[in-house]
Regions:
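Alpha-helical transmembrane segments and immediately membrane-proximal extracytoplasmic
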Residues: 1-246
Length: 246
């Protein structure tokens, strides 16, 4: 392999630093807050078993992302039958509104809602959280399929964090901090090629220590590898498997 010139790293890094700084300045100027320590997750003593747990959580996160992609493709297929864009948007917006009324935790990007889920997880029924999880993915799919504009990353962080709470409630032996922080970023990490950046998001937003960050990084890697493996397998047997974009 030809050696990579050191100048290329600088050429690639500087625009990213400038873009990230500008984005932070705009976000902080508008929102007046950051994601630092946004989610009050209790700290727990690190165990070597947490590393293996990270693998399992990563695989579970991959399954959630695959289910989301299937929901999106199904909704897009149905929405595509409506030729009039105005009617399609009207129906899509109405359905998103119905979901929001039935499941208020699905409203918005998900930052404040995830904080509420984490803070009240001891009193929220696990099946209600499952309904919220499915409702959020369905609302996102409807938005994407019917012409609404918005990003996927923050809503998928909500999906991941909520899934982590569900995992802990179903399997209490999995530490709360590990389940929430790992699933928080492993779900979007299934398709986003930024494992280090996603791990930092979990560390900074949850306030993890360096040891707890290890299973998070493993979960992100396991999620991405699992998803890539499934996609490669399907493409080997079916030529029409779509690309996954975020």
């Amino acid at each position: 392999l030809a050696p990579i010139r050191r100048e290329r790293y600088v050429e690639g890094l500087l625009p990213q630093l400038i873009a990230a700084t500008a984005a932070f300045a705009v976000f902080f100027g508008v929102a007046g807050s950051t994601l630092l320590n946004s989610f009050a997750v209790p700290t727990e003593e690190f165990s070597a078993w947490d590393l293996l747990t990270g693998v399992g959580l990563g695989i579970a996160a991959s399954v959630i992302m695959i289910v989301f992609v299937l929901i999106v493709k199904l909704v897009q297929a149905v929405a595509g039958k409506v030729s009039n864009g105005l009617v399609r948007g009207l129906v899509g917006g109405g359905l998103v509104g119905v979901i929001a009324v039935a499941l208020p935790l699905t409203v918005g990007a998900g930052n404040d809602q995830l904080s509420a889920v984490i803070d009240e997880s001891a009193t929220i029924n696990v099946w209600l959280l499952v309904a919220v999880l499915i409702g959020k993915m369905l609302a996102m799919a409807l938005s994407l399929a019917t012409g609404f504009i918005g990003g996927n990353v923050l809503p998928m962080l909500f999906v991941g964090g909520t899934a982590g709470v569900i995992v802990h409630l179903i399997i209490p032996d999995i530490p709360y901090a590990v389940a929430v922080s790992a699933m928080l970023v492993a779900v979007p990490g299934a398709v986003i090629k930024a494992p280090i950046g996603l791990t930092f998001i979990a560390v900074l937003s949850v306030g993890l220590g360096p040891l707890t960050a290890a299973p998070v990084a493993i979960a992100v890697a396991a999620s991405h590898i699992t998803t890539a493996g499934v996609v490669a397998f399907l493409r080997a047997h079916r030529a029409d498997v779509p690309e996954v974009h975020t």
